[in-house]
């Protein structure tokens, strides 16, 4: 990985899953921010840069899909650096949304290798600047 630690924001209201992802990414050398709600995620992004976002679709007060659009609208550099996590990837609503808003889709249950591979692809590509910084 590059010399500067890359920051990954994990947005999932399932605290046990969020903690597993946080620990795994920290072991790989990433700086990790965790949010259990859309509001917290937006506040964290407003407070400082993130290089990639792992975003659950089902959040308590706002859908992850709506948060995705809000993030890309405010921080266009994060477009292409947000992966949607869901167990409902085959639902019509999700398929239609993904067709209109291309982004990475990580189907739950996923394995950590899928997360690491996606992060390597979006963060280590030559010429990639920091996300919303």
Task: Give the location of each predicted region.
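Charged docking surfaces used in two-component/phosphorelay signaling
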Residues: 19-27
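Acidic, metal-coordinating helix/loop segments flanking the phosphotransfer/catalytic sites
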Residues: 34-52
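Non-catalytic signal-transmission and effector/linker regions of two-component phosphorelay proteins
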Residues: 1-9, 15, 73-78, 111-133
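Active-site residues of response regulator receiver
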Residues: 56
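Acidic catalytic/metal-coordinating carboxylates
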Residues: 37, 63-67
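The feature encodes the CheY-like receiver
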Residues: 18, 60, 90
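Residue-level signal for the "D+5" position in two-component response regulator receiver
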Residues: 34, 59-62
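Hydrophobic/aromatic residues positioned on beta-strands within the core alpha/beta folds
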Residues: 85-86
């Amino acid at each position: 990985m590059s010399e500067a630690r890359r920051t990954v924001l994990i947005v999932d209201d399932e605290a046990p899953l969020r903690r597993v992802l946080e620990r795994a990414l920290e072991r790989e050398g990433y700086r990790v921010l965790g949010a259990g709600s859309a509001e917290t995620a937006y506040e964290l992004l407003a407070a400082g840069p993130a290089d990639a976002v792992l975003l659950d679709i089902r959040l308590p007060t706002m859908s992850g899909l709506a948060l995705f659009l809000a993030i890309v609208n405010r921080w266009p550099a994060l477009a292409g650096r947000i992966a949607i996590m869901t167990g409902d990837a085959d639902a019509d609503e999700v398929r239609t949304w993904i067709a209109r808003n291309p982004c990475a889709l990580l189907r739950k249950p996923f394995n950590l290798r899928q997360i690491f591979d996606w992060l390597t692809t979006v963060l280590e590509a030559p010429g990639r600047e920091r996300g919303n910084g």
